[in-house]
A protein has these predicted regions:
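A subset of signal/propeptide-processing and intrinsically disordered low-complexity segments
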Residues: 3-5, 35, 69, 375
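Methionine residue identity
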Residues: 1-2, 9
Length: 543
């Protein structure tokens, strides 16, 4: 019995000793870098333990404080091609920006003059300070106060020179800041492929022959709208959304909700087959990220484009956040402030997300229903390519990725049996970031108009996809660089983006073009049926 008690006592002493050792070790916490401390807030493990089991590659991905990436506009190129940038502003309907290139040249010239103006006072300040130091040493060594008056004069002169130098330096800094502001405000240069003006160029058709159009084209029926069809079949509910949220929102119900998910999964599947990697991005971003991608809170007509999120008083010091209008914004920012190894290019991502648009402005018959809404699901394609010119190394360029985008869009819309046309968009329709853009529009039967014995096809087309080449516009503003690969010097990659699936618009087009008036059903495109339980037609929901 005594032996057991002694053993228990020894065990307790051992436990106490181990616990004391643990406390002493814990009090001597080793140095942990700031990044690891920040990431530790989300990690239940203590710093020493986490560092012991964390690879160096993971530590490179730790959470960093939110700071806007430093933009690097190509000021040298703007100065060397000022006339081209001025014309580009006019062509792209940015008349107020047309004087910016010349103003940038003037400010840079002024900055150079100021640099020259600084040389004399800085040199004189150095001389005066050396003289002051020499006189001060003499006074200290010899106890001579006769030079005090001279010292006072020299110090006054030095102060005057410093004040003048400070004023010149301040003005030079102002010039530099203004040059950057003006340069970042300029729209991207347009591609030679982009038509100048307001009219797009017709590239071709998908599932449509103008000489032999579908039968419904010859008998326009405004009642054949996706709103009427979707409501009668129990697929769309605008009444409830008007109660819950207001104009511009909707409920997709029954097979309508299934059709939405089928479109998402099908488009993701096609993109993956083409080598694009799936990503699920956030729908809230820092406002400076949206701006760096070329999305302004208001357009050139001062109409609201982006919703910002109101911050509480305790968060006022934090960066403003906004609702993303497209997954293009968070996807582009995945490499903000980072270097991409040249060997990793091209990078091709596809992401489905909820998108939010303020969509300010008038609302007409051609934008009713699902066509223009405030919140919707969209599958977006985004890619980075090297900015080097194609050569013997077979570098994948932005033109290559752009062609890949278009082939994915064409495959999806062709398989959905939607009548489409492909347009090369004009300069006035490019926005700020795009150098080149192609849209694909679907023929909406409800938009057909007849008059004087003819049917107006032009009014029936509605955009469902868009693809853009942004060259280095976004990467310069997001601080994304390429290092290594086919060249030693660092450079800014090109970015491309495009719509794989704008769900509500394509869903609306399927309802209108796939509607069988005689049977009162909508034919489900064969490629979507596997995601809808084999359903071939959508009939009226009896419940």
């Amino acid at each position: 019995m005594m032996t057991n008690q002694k053993a228990d006592m020894n065990f307790s002493i051992l436990q106490l000793s181990l616990f004391t050792t643990f406390l002493m070790a814990s009090s001597r916490t080793p140095y942990v870098c700031l990044n690891c401390r920040l990431s530790n807030k989300l990690n239940p493990l203590s710093s020493p333990i986490r560092r012991r089991f964390t690879s160096s590659s993971y530590r490179q991905q730790v959470i960093r404080p939110a700071t806007a990436p430093k933009p690097t506009p190509n000021i040298k190129h703007i100065c060397q091609n000022a006339d081209a940038y001025t014309k580009n502003c006019i062509d792209r309907n940015y008349p107020s920006h047309a004087e910016y290139p010349l103003r940038i040249q003037q400010l840079l010239e002024e900055s150079r003059r100021l640099d020259q103006d600084l040389k004399t006072p800085r040199s004189r300040i150095k001389q005066v300070e050396q003289t002051i130091a020499k006189l001060a040493r003499q006074n200290a060594q010899q106890g001579d106060t006769n030079s005090d008056e001279e010292l006072a004069r020299l110090r006054a002169e030095a102060q005057q020179l410093k004040d003048k130098s400070h004023a010149v330096t301040t003005r030079k800094s102002t010039c530099t800041d203004e040059v950057h502001r003006l340069a970042l405000s300029l729209p991207n240069l347009s591609s030679p492929e982009t038509p100048v003006g307001h009219d797009p160029k017709l590239i071709g058709y998908i599932n449509f022959d103008p000489q032999s159009p579908p039968e419904y084209v010859s008998r326009p029926d405004p009642a054949r709208s996706h709103v009427a069809i979707g409501t009668s079949l129990g697929l769309i509910d605008f009444t409830s959304s008007a109660t819950t949220t207001g104009w511009g929102w909707y409920f997709l119900t029954n097979e309508g909700a299934l059709l939405e998910q089928a479109l998402i999964q099908y488009s993701l599947n096609v993109a993956r087959r083409h080598g694009w990697k799936p990503v699920s991005p956030p729908s809230i971003v820092y406002s400076y990220i949206a701006e760096a991608c070329g999305f302004q809170p208001r357009d050139q007509h001062n109409e609201q484009q982006i919703w910002t999120i109101e911050q509480s008083e305790k968060d006022k010091s934090k960066p403003q956040r906004s609702l993303a209008g497209t997954a293009e914004i968070p996807l582009a920012a995945m490499y903000a402030g980072r270097d991409i190894p040249g060997s990793d290019l091209p990078i091709k991502l596809v992401g489905a997300s909820r998108c939010y648009r303020a969509e300010a402005g008038s609302r007409g018959v051609d934008t009713k229903g699902l066509y223009r809404v405030h919140e919707f699901t969209k599958v977006e394609l985004f890619g980075w390519s090297d900015s080097l010119s194609p050569d013997a190394t077979s570098t994948v360029t932005s033109d290559t990725l752009f062609a890949d985008l278009l082939s994915i869009q064409s495959e999806i819309l062709t398989s959905l049996n939607l009548p489409c046309r492909i347009l090369e968009m004009p300069t006035t329709d490019l926005g700020a970031s795009a150098s080149r853009k192609q849209d694909i529009e679907v023929l909406f039967p409800s938009r057909l108009r007849s008059g004087s014995g003819n049917v107006d096809l032009e009014s029936a087309w509605g955009e469902v996809t868009s693809s853009s080449i942004c060259t280095d516009y976004q990467s310069r503003r997001l601080g994304t660089r390429v290092r290594g690969g086919a060249a030693k010097e660092s450079r800014f990659p090109h970015t491309v983006n495009g719509t794989a699936m704008a769900v509500p618009r394509v869903l609306a087009a399927i309802l209108e073009t796939g509607y069988d008036a005689e049977r009162g059903v909508v034919v489900v495109p064969p490629v979507l049926r596997s995601w809808m339980g084999g359903m071939e037609v959508i009939v009226e929901n009896e419940s």
